[in-house]
Regions:
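Extended, low-polarity segments enriched in aliphatic/aromatic residues
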Residues: 2-201
Length: 201
């Protein structure tokens, strides 16, 4: 779902270090919970979930004994604002989980950008992407909308659905994801209101 420096764990960690989140400044190591490419996930039941019955959570987060979150409170165009619930819910979701929260549909492929490499075909567990005439296409009947193909594409040719979740649905899905992560586990949250930015950081 995310492109650029948050597309895979190594560059994500480098970006964190450059922004002051390193073991030297925080005393904690950084682990990207859903693994190198966002595919290491645990399926977690959402107690009483209305929009999400089973959340796709980064596996390393579900292996933790306790959740301690340090949140930068800020504005968000998609959700209005972001704090602990957004940090836990969206941040804890695997790539497929983030896709589920952000979108109600299925990805599509830009033929102009596609080079026919087959990365999307190899990552898909459902056989939805196919290569025809040296270009990938998605069989929407087979696609489950998990978004793994988005992260696998080296050319950013696989795009999320144009119609995203409404703000109300997105906020509710994030809250349900946060509930799936926190339910029945000890947790502690600190939110800082400093350098409030108008967009997600």
């Amino acid at each position: 779902l995310y492109v650029g420096r948050r597309k895979h764990a190594l560059e994500h960690i480098t970006a964190a270090y450059e922004n002051g989140f390193s073991p030297f400044s925080t005393g904690c190591h950084i682990i990207i919970a859903d693994g190198l490419k966002g595919t290491d996930e645990a399926y977690v039941t959402v107690p009483g979930g209305e929009l999400v019955q089973e959340a796709k959570i980064g596996k390393a987060l579900m292996d933790a004994d306790i959740v301690i979150s340090l949140n930068h409170f800020k504005r968000s165009r998609a959700t209005g604002f972001g704090g602990a619930i957004k940090n836990i819910g969206m941040g804890g979701g695997s790539r497929a989980g983030k896709m589920e929260m952000h979108h109600d549909g299925k990805p599509h492929i830009s033929e102009r950008k596609c080079i026919g490499c087959g990365a999307c075909v190899r990552i898909c567990a459902h056989g939805a992407p196919i290569i025809e005439n040296k270009k990938a296409h998605i069989d929407l009947d087979k696609c489950v909308g998990c978004g793994r193909c988005i992260g696998a594409c080296p050319m950013d040719a696989v795009k999320p659905p144009a119609d995203g979740s409404s703000m109300e649905a997105l906020n509710k899905k994030m809250a349900e994801y946060a509930w799936a992560i926190l339910h029945g586990r000890p947790a502690f949250h600190i939110s800082l209101i400093v350098d409030v930015s108008p967009y997600c950081d």
